[in-house]
Amino acid sequence: PSIDPTLIDSATRPLVARITAALAQGDDGALKIIIEIFEHAGFQVVGFGQVMPELLPPLGILSHRAPNRQDQDDAARAAAVIVGMSPLDIGQACAVAGSHVLAVEAYGGTEWMLQSLIARRQAWPTGGILFKAPKTGQERRIDLPAIGPATCRQVKKAGLDGIVIAHGGVV
């Protein structure tokens, strides 16, 4: 984004070049620099899970349906995809069905990814899962992946069988 230097106070002005360079590094790089700036100013940055751990889902099956063997295999494949994409800072989610990677989250986010599945639902294998987890090395204190009711509705509309999340890594 462009930054209008006339809107920046004198205390912040020296940080503009650093913030601009960080933004060019992608989400992970930018967030790490922002945390460094706050910590250098004397703030302690903590994740909401440290302050309100009850907001993180518990370990285990959170729905009425337990995953079958194929769901488990799909989740394992999806986890490997997220780990593989992590160094590229691409996304935090993917959809897998029958061991086939149907879609990966990119710049457009999870909603866009799921909309792309909904638009071509008949072209994909049936079933499958949405997998969501932090990227390897992701700064979890201020960038924790989230899933809400709208995501759940889209997963159903896309014809996926369920959602698998990384314990302690998704809200």
Q: At which residue positions do the language-model features occur?
A:
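C-terminal binding/interaction regions
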Residues: 149-171
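Short basic, glycine-rich beta-strand/loop surfaces that mediate nucleic-acid
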Residues: 5, 19, 169-171
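Active-site gating loops and adjacent loop-to-helix segments of metal-dependent hydrolytic enzymes
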Residues: 8-18
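Conserved mixed alpha/beta catalytic, RNA-binding, or beta-rich assembly cores of soluble enzyme
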Residues: 2-8, 24-28, 41, 46-153
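Hydrophobic alpha-helical hairpins/lids featuring a short glycine-rich hinge
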Residues: 32-39
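Short, basic, glycine/proline-bearing loop/turn elements
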Residues: 18-20, 132-138, 162-165
